Structure formats: structure tokens, C-alpha cells
Design a protein with these regions (language model features):
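Secondary-structure end/capping motifs
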Residues: 221-307
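Periplasmic-binding protein-like
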Residues: 107-117, 188, 192-219, 226, ...
């Protein structure tokens, strides 16, 4: 009798699991880079099944790399959900006659773009970049926003991300573009803690950074899943802000091997939370407040579309839907 009861329980459990699996909406997921400590809440949400609780089977398939390639993958249907910089959404949609993706949740309330220089360079302000060499990328967001910030005319040296820190610390360039959550920690890990950061957000307060995106095809096929995804993201972000260490523990691999690696990723997560997510605006209005964000996003779309000389400018709702 006991054996029959156990078997019945197992069958019931399997049936329940199968039923749950049938109710889940599959979503192929791309990180822009990393994943690092600031991305770790997504992995935690997969591991602790928060996404499943909201009916989403989120499956990481890799990294862009970068926000533009992440956006291109979503627009082409190679991925369904992304974690990327909003500039990538503007760029990819602006290069297409038919927009292929949109942001559904703003994670970082401030732009992560910046310019880094060693203190020994004497660079202290944006105007100090005049005539100085800056490691950059021709289509990079920061490079195209600098003319909005200052009349200074830097001498740009084209280089990939991997060469930014080596070129800066070796003196091949006076300064280098970089994201706040990557360049800062790459310099620290390389043994160069004395540097200055010129933050784009200090001059362009309307600019934002990372968002959660969905491909238009996936959203059209799964409209209810989009709202469920927003709810899962908000729940996980609130937990991550409260306890980033719990999220970072979901990271696996060489980044978090050893006490030093884990410590750096925890600090990266805390820095991202304090500087980019929990701004005074978010403390006052809450996460992903569409009425507060919409005017800022519209202006950012206008400015970046013009500065990047994008061939197509669409209605604002083609770039984001936060509700």
C-alpha cells in the first residue's frame, strides 16, 4: 500500500511538473557583456525559478557581444529577450525601416557612458579633452555625445574594448572611453586605482543605460508574457538592490573564482545599484516609472538619432513600452 502511495505521489509530481512546463513561455536570452555582478540578478532569477513563477522559461544563449549586436540578434529573431544599453535599441531600430525590438523595463536610470584618464594626465573636465588622444570606437555612443557636452575636440584613436585599459595605462592614449561598470573595475584589477571619470550622465541627465528588451516578434506572439516578464524583473531587481551578494552568488566561472574575484563582482553590483539604478529620481518615483521616464527617453532618442546620423527615425513607441 505504501509503495502504491509513493508511486502515485511521484506520478502526480511529474504530472504537475509537466503541466507547469507546458504553461511556460520559452524565451532565448542575451546579455550584452559578461555576465558580471551587475547582471547577476538575472541568473539568480533563473536559478531560484522566479522567472518560472511568472510563466517564463528564460534560457541564456550567450552575449551580444555589446548592445548593438544584442539588439541585432533580437531584431533578427535569434534571441527573444535582451539586457542591453538603450543606445543599442536606438541604433538598431534607427538603421532599419521596420523596428525589430523595444525596451520594456529601464534598469539603469543613468547613462553608463564615460571617459577615463589617469590622474597623472592632468585631465579633470570635459574641456580638458581638447587636443588629447582618446581611445574610442567610431560608432560608439560616448564619442558621438561628446560634441553635445563640450566644444573640446579630442583626437580619437580607434580601438576595440579589449585595448582600452592597456592603451591607457601604457600611455598610448591620454584618455579612453568606457562604461562605468566595466572600465572602472578593469582599471582596478589592473592595479591602477588612481583615475578620474568624466560621466556623461552628469551633463546629459536625460540619458539612461541598460534596459530589458524584447524582440517585436516574440512580444507579438506572447503579449501576456511581456507583462509577466516586467513583473519578474521588478521583483528580482528589488531583491538585488536589497541584497546584491545573494545575486552575485549565482555567478559561476573564472570571474568569481577566489575571494578577490567574488569581492570585485559584489562591489561592481553595489556600485551599479548605487550609481546607476537607485538614483534620487528612482527613490522618489520608483523603478521603471513610465510617466517620468518617457520625456527623458524621447529626448535621448532625438539626440542620439541625430548624432549617430541614423537613416530612420520612428515614433517613440517603437523604441520602448514600459507599461
Amino acid at each position: 500500500m505504501l509503495k502504491k502511495t509513493l508511486i502515485a505521489s511521484i506520478v502526480l509530481a511529474v504530472a504537475s511538473t509537466s503541466a507547469l512546463a507546458k504553461e511556460l513561455t520559452d524565451a532565448k536570452f542575451l546579455f550584452d557583456v559578461g555576465p558580471y555582478g551587475n547582471h547577476s540578478w538575472v541568473l539568480k532569477g533563473i536559478k531560484d525559478r522566479t522567472f518560472e513563477k511568472y510563466g517564463i522559461n528564460l534560457v541564456p544563449i550567450g552575449v551580444g557581444p555589446g548592445s548593438v549586436k544584442t539588439g541585432m540578434a533580437l531584431a533578427a529573431g535569434k534571441a527573444d529577450v535582451g539586457y542591453q544599453d538603450f543606445s543599442g535599441v536606438i541604433t538598431v531600430n534607427g538603421k532599419s525601416e521596420t523596428p525589430g525590438l523595444k525596451a520594456i523595463f529601464v534598469v539603469d536610470d543613468r547613462a553608463q557612458d564615460g571617459v577615463y584618464a589617469l590622474k597623472s594626465s592632468g585631465i579633470k573636465t570635459w574641456d580638458d579633452l581638447d587636443g588629447r588622444t582618446v581611445g574610442s570606437f567610431p560608432t560608439g555612443t560616448t564619442r558621438n555625445l561628446i560634441p553635445v557636452i563640450t566644444t573640446a575636440k579630442p583626437s580619437y584613436v580607434n580601438m576595440p574594448f579589449a585595448l582600452r585599459v592597456p592603451s591607457l595605462v601604457s600611455g598610448k592614449v591620454d584618455a579612453s572611453e568606457g562604461f562605468l561598470t566595466t572600465m572602472k573595475f578593469n582599471l582596478i584589477k589592473s592595479g591602477y586605482p588612481d583615475f578620474i571619470t568624466l560621466q556623461v550622465a552628469d551633463k546629459l541627465p536625460y540619458a539612461i543605460s541598460r534596459v530589458i528588451t524584447v524582440s517585436n516578434a516574440w512580444a507579438a506572439a506572447n503579449p501576456e508574457a511581456v507583462d509577466k516578464l516586467r513583473k519578474a524583473v521588478k521583483e528580482l531587481l528589488v531583491e538585488h538592490i536589497d541584497d546584491p551578494e545573494a545575486s552575485v552568488r549565482a555567478l559561476k566561472g573564472p570571474l568569481t573564482m577566489g575571494a578577490k574575484g567574488m569581492s570585485i563582482e559584489i562591489e561592481r553590483a553595489k556600485f551599479n545599484n548605487a550609481v546607476l539604478i537607485m538614483t534620487d529620481r528612482v527613490k522618489k518615483h520608483g523603478l521603471n516609472n513610465s510617466s517620468v521616464l518617457a520625456p527623458r527617453l524621447d529626448k535621448y532618442i532625438d539626440v542620439l538619432s541625430e548624432k549617430l546620423r541614423l537613416p530612420n527615425k520612428h515614433a517613440y513607441y517603437e523604441y520602448y513600452d514600459l507599461d
